[in-house]
Amino acid sequence: MPKLKTRRSAAKRFKRSGSGKFMRRKAYKNHLLEHKGPDRKSRLSKKCVVSEQDAENVRAMMPYS
């Protein structure tokens, strides 16, 4: 049976944590940052966990992670 391919776009966006959950960056932190407060920008800089509903799709896109 041939190897499964990893979707490279997903591999660049998601990382697996030590406990097996997928981590992702938060949105709204690329541009138009002048009017956003420092607390908000700090909060948006942190990583967060992918929801359980989406984790199934991410797992299918990255079979070897």
UniProtKB/Swiss-Prot annotation:
GO terms (molecular function) for this protein are: structural constituent of ribosome
- Which key words are in the record? Ribonucleoprotein, Ribosomal protein
**What is the annotated signal peptide range for this record?**
none
User: GO:BP terms for this protein?
Assistant: translation
Q: Which Pfam families match?
A: Ribosomal_L35p (PF01632)
The answer to whether keyword Ribonucleoprotein applies is yes
Q: Name one GO cellular component term.
A: cytosolic large ribosomal subunit
Which SUPFAM superfamilies did the record assign? L35p-like (SSF143034)
Q: Which InterPro entries match?
A: Ribosomal_bL35, Ribosomal_bL35-like, Ribosomal_bL35_CS, Ribosomal_bL35_sf
Family the UniProt entry places it in: Belongs to the bacterial ribosomal protein bL35 family.
Spell out the protein name for this chain.
Answer: Large ribosomal subunit protein bL35
